[in-house]
C-alpha cells in the first residue's frame, strides 16, 4: 500500500489554489507532487480545491504505478467525508471530486486517515509547504473535472 500525505493552499491576492502531495511507497521511496490553478470554480472554494486535487493526484499516481491500495492522509475532513457520503457534496466541484474518487475506488482500494494540521507531523508539514510553494508556479493550471484532472 502507498501512503500519501495531501494538503491544499490558497492565496487570495493572486487568486490561486494549490496542492501538495508526499507519496511514500512500501520500499521506502518518497515522491512529491504539487500543482496550482486559478479556475474560477476552484478559486471559489479556496484551499479546498487544492485538498481535493492532492487526493486525486495521489490516487492517480498509485494507479499509474500499479499499486493495489492507497491511504490518503489529510488534515481537511472533506477529503474523506465527501467520498464516503458522510458529508453531502454541495458544490459542483465537491460533487465532481466525490464522483471521481468513488469511481477510482472501483479500480484501487482507497482508505483515509485524518492527521492533525500544523502539529509537527513531518510529511503533513511537507505537503503543506509543497502546496504553498506551488501557489507561485503558473506554468500549469490544475482544475477538477468529472472523469479526470485537467492540466491546461
Name these PLM-found stretches.
Residues 50-54:
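Loop-to-helix element that buttresses phosphate recognition and phosphoryl-transfer chemistry
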Residues 1-49, 60-61:
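RNase H-like nuclease fold core
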Residues 9-15, 56-126, 130, 135, ...:
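RNase H catalytic domain
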Residues 150-152:
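A cross-taxonomic marker for long C-terminal extensions/tails that follow the last structured domain
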Amino acid at each position: 500500500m502507498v501512503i500519501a500525505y495531501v494538503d491544499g493552499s490558497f492565496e487570495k491576492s493572486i487568486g490561486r489554489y494549490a496542492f501538495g502531495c508526499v507519496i511514500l511507497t512500501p520500499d521506502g521511496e518518497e515522491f512529491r507532487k504539487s500543482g496550482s490553478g486559478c479556475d474560477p470554480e476552484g478559486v471559489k472554494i479556496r484551499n479546498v480545491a487544492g485538498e481535493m486535487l492532492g487526493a486525486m493526484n495521489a490516487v492517480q499516481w498509485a494507479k499509474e504505478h500499479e499499486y493495489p491500495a492507497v491511504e490518503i492522509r489529510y488534515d481537511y475532513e472533506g477529503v474523506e467525508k465527501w467520498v464516503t457520503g458522510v458529508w453531502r457534496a454541495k458544490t459542483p466541484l465537491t460533487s465532481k471530486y466525490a464522483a471521481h474518487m468513488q469511481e477510482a475506488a472501483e479500480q484501487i482500494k482507497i482508505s483515509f486517515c485524518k492527521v492533525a494540521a500544523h502539529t509537527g507531523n513531518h510529511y503533513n508539514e511537507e505537503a503543506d509547504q509543497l502546496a504553498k510553494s506551488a501557489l507561485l508556479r503558473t506554468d500549469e493550471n490544475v482544475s477538477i473535472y468529472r472523469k479526470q484532472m485537467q492540466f491546461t
